[in-house]
Amino acid sequence: MTMSSLNAPALELRGISKSYGTVRAVKPLDLVVPQGATYGLLGPNGAGKTTTIRMVLRILTPDTGTILILGRPQSQEGLDRIGYLPEERGVYRRMKVRALLAFFAELKGVRRRDSRPRIDRWLERMELADRADSKLEELSKGNQQKVQFIGSILHEPEIMVLDEPFSGLDPINQRVLREIITELKAAGRTIIFSTHIIEHAERICDHVAIIARGSKVADGPIAAVKREHGEEYVAIRLEQWTADAVSVVRRLAGVARVREHGTELEVALRDGADPQRLLHELVATGVRLRRFEVTEPSLEQIFIERVGARDADVPAEELAHV
């Protein structure tokens, strides 16, 4: 029997804020994370993502606002239902892997006799079974990170909070972690993870919130966020890239913006532009196409337009906190 209610959100933030002196790291913020969601907290470095997570976990105290976990005010009982992988990796380097994981599990109320089979299962899954009796300092940084992830999940939490979880992992281990997140979601767990790498959110999440300079600029199911964005896009693949061909596309009357990816072009249309007319005009110019498809905006496009280049650079003194 858990403390969760079927009708309550996994996490609800009501007007929480946090300042460090004159720096407003998080302005009054409202968020609702449904149970069972894979929820991406997106934003550039220094946006306030980590500060928000630390307030959820009671590492920091909000200046204002209320936080509800599974429908109830923050409490140790609620926090024990959360697994947390911090952005700052931290392990006891001289401890052995199995001993460290048993210690982490015990901190969350899991007895050693119960944690042993869980530890063995996760070490096998993460291809670390042969390092169970190695000291952490003998492991690579990537393997240390995998150990820390195992430590965050041994108590089988209902909610997982992962702060930049893919940082430091090679592509193979990034794929393994994505598979695990997908399995956890299928099992009904709520996954909240922060990232500034939009591709990860696009692949994994069903809900997102985009934060810039401590304020929420978009929030909701990904499909709804894309619909609300409003603009229509066309994906074009040229038979062969040439500067002249790209220039022709840019000059067409219905085109607002073009982003290049080799022979692939992402074209944002002006209000009222007709994609069929655009295709007709493009063919008439003699530009040879391999693909022309009306598409929805990518999260990356929405992120760039909502956040803006101005927020991509945040002063170093702010980054130290947020």
What does each model-identified segment do?
Residues 2-5, 270-322:
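C-terminal coupling/interaction segments
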Residues 18, 257-260, 294:
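Hydrophobic/anchoring residues in structured secondary elements
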Residues 178-270:
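ABC transporter nucleotide-binding domain
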